[in-house]
């Protein structure tokens, strides 16, 4: 199997405190059929360095205050290369009417496509007292859709446990989704900064 991709990215900074970025990725994988071969994934990010604004000049104890946010998409095609193809195997030392047996090893799923991951991140980075205290507060949200997983095939498919392989009575397919979110907090404190440095 092989993969190929096209990538574009733009970054823009205005007055050294307004930040904007965007990217586009188009990925292709030979693991999928022609109709589903490509996946398009976008991302955008922005930032505002609040501490550089004129109204923050009297807040001398604030070394840095930055608001940031981003949205991004990525794809996953971590599946065997034969998912969209029927494959067969020959049973060794097993014959019927002097002919060696052949059985269906993998049943094709031509509808398989890219799994997509979407993420949203919002955060506030800070540094206080001449960078003696710094850290971040962030919220994240992750969503995975069209998850690539094995699904059990019914006995009527005719390949239940063919050849003694427990995996080939199932098929890779886009089934299910996953969602999680949460908050992250980070703080670093420099307690002493003279002849030696003590971090906590």
PLM features: residue spans?
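Extracellular/periplasmic, surface-exposed regions of secreted and cell-surface proteins
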Residues: 1-200
């Amino acid at each position: 199997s092989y993969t190929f991709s096209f990538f574009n990215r733009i970054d823009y900074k205005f007055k050294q405190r307004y930040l904007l970025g965007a990217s586009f990725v188009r990925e292709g994988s030979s693991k999928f059929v022609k109709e589903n071969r490509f996946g398009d994934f976008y991302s955008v990010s922005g930032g505002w360095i609040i501490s550089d604004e004129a109204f923050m000049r009297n807040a001398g104890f604030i070394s840095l205050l930055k608001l940031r946010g981003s949205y991004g998409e990525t794809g996953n095609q971590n599946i065997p290369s034969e998912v969209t193809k029927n494959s067969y195997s020959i049973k060794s030392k097993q014959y019927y009417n002097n002919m060696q047996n052949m059985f269906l090893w993998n049943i094709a799923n031509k509808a398989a496509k890219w799994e997509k991951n979407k993420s949203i991140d919002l955060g506030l980075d800070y540094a206080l007292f001449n960078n003696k205290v710094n850290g971040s507060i962030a919220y994240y949200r992750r969503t995975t859709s069209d998850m690539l997983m094995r699904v059990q095939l019914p006995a009527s498919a005719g390949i239940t446990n063919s050849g003694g392989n427990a995996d080939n009575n199932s098929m890779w397919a886009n089934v299910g989704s996953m969602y999680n979110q949460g908050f992250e907090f980070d703080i670093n404190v420099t307690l002493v900064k003279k002849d030696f440095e003590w971090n906590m």
